[in-house]
């Protein structure tokens, strides 16, 4: 079964919503973004998060010590690196589950991956959180020895097609479950139901 990550939670209402509809993962963005949260905000949100839902911290080219301390304080389940973090950087986080984002341009980008310290690879377009897809055919039925997380422009209307083409382990949605810049409870409900019904 394909798992679901809802990314970019900021408000108490967002937590109440995901606690009700139970995605597998939720993401908290610590890099500069309209969805950015700070440590104190994240601490309060995670404190109210259902224990069955795993927390993911999203970081972009942050200082190593900041990422490590934030991840320890919040007891994050997953650290997602979305910048230019290399193997030397990622090896300092081997006590955590690590996802590394790849801005997909061609199939070789995926096949030539050699992220020793990453447990999962996030396939995204060049501009994360933009709501735009990359060409999924590039990743058609690709096989890697890590969790494959598909992001970038996914929503309730196209997630079935995306799942059929790429066959990911996890789908990662942010703007695809928003209305006017905020997480939309009905869209989250419909998205999760749609993914749970994919055969």
From Swiss-Prot:
Belongs to the TrpF family. Pfam families: PRAI. It comes from the Bacteria. Keywords: Amino-acid biosynthesis, Aromatic amino acid biosynthesis, Isomerase, Tryptophan biosynthesis. The gene is trpF. Pathway: Amino-acid biosynthesis; L-tryptophan biosynthesis; L-tryptophan from chorismate: step 3/5. One of its GO terms (molecular function) is phosphoribosylanthranilate isomerase activity. InterPro entries: Aldolase_TIM, PRAI_dom, RibuloseP-bd_barrel, TrpF_fam. GO terms for biological process: L-tryptophan biosynthetic process. It comes from Clostridium kluyveri (strain ATCC 8527 / DSM 555 / NBRC 12016 / NCIMB 10680 / K1). It catalyses: N-(5-phospho-beta-D-ribosyl)anthranilate = 1-(2-carboxyphenylamino)-1-deoxy-D-ribulose 5-phosphate. It is an enzyme of class 5 (isomerase). Its EC number is 5.3.1.24. This is N-(5'-phosphoribosyl)anthranilate isomerase.
């Amino acid at each position: 079964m394909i798992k679901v990550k809802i990314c970019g939670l900021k408000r108490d209402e967002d937590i109440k919503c995901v606690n009700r509809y139970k995605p597998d993962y939720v993401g908290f963005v610590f890099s500069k973004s309209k969805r950015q949260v700070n440590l104190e905000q994240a601490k309060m949100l995670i404190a109210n998060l259902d224990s069955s839902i795993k927390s993911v911290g999203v970081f972009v080219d942050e200082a190593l010590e900041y990422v490590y301390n934030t991840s320890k304080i919040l007891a994050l389940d997953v650290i997602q690196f979305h910048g230019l973090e290399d193997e030397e950087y990622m090896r300092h986080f081997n006590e955590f589950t690590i996802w590394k984002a790849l801005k997909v341009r061609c199939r070789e980008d995926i096949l030539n991956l050699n992220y020793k310290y990453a447990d999962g690879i996030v396939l995204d377009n060049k501009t994360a959180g933009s709501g735009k897809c990359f060409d999924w055919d590039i990743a058609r039925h690709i096989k890697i020895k890590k969790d494959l997380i598909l992001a970038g422009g996914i929503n309730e209307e196209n997630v079935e097609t995306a799942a059929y083409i790429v066959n990911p382990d996890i789908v990662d949605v942010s703007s695809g479950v928003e209305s006017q810049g905020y997480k939309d409870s009905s869209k989250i409900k419909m998205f999760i139901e749609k993914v749970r019904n994919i055969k």
